[in-house]
Amino acid sequence: MKILAIQNRMGIGDTVIFLPYIKAISEKFKVPVSLLVKENSKADQFLNQSNYIDKIILLERSKKKESRHNGIVGFFKLAKDLKKHKFDKIFIFNSSLRFFLIARLSGIKDIYQYPLFKKNNQHIVQPAIDLIKKNLSVEINSNPEIQLNINLINNAILKFNIKNEELNILLGIGGSESSKRI
């Protein structure tokens, strides 16, 4: 079985917020899940060690006219790109009619997504919680984890001279929109 999840929000933090839901899909169906994400999510750089992620597929869609998946031509290119993977199921983490139609055109049989046409002031995680609970009967602990290779962690400890006996502070600058507060 091959499963795709679409998370097309902009940044790293947006992608991280959805990891518990993607992991729940993987655990429910006992297969790693492929992700369709925007390049600026950097998912290909920080999720490449996650055992519940199969492939990272980049959505080439931006305000630049020459982006591969922009416009009506891009719509069909994306459908063609996804069709090659022969996905059985897709979880679309937004209310997009575009992605619903692309999934249909790609031949994906089982499509799960947020209710269509209900985007206004949509909270970032509540629809994901509802989607997973409704379709998988799974309660999610919204506590994202990123799997990292222990060697990378040890290299960072050495490089930045991190010591357990000292207070280490990490600032995570991110979204401030009310829809992104959890």
Question: Over which residues does each language-model region extend?
Answer:
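Catalytic machinery of carbohydrate-active enzymes
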Residues: 1-182
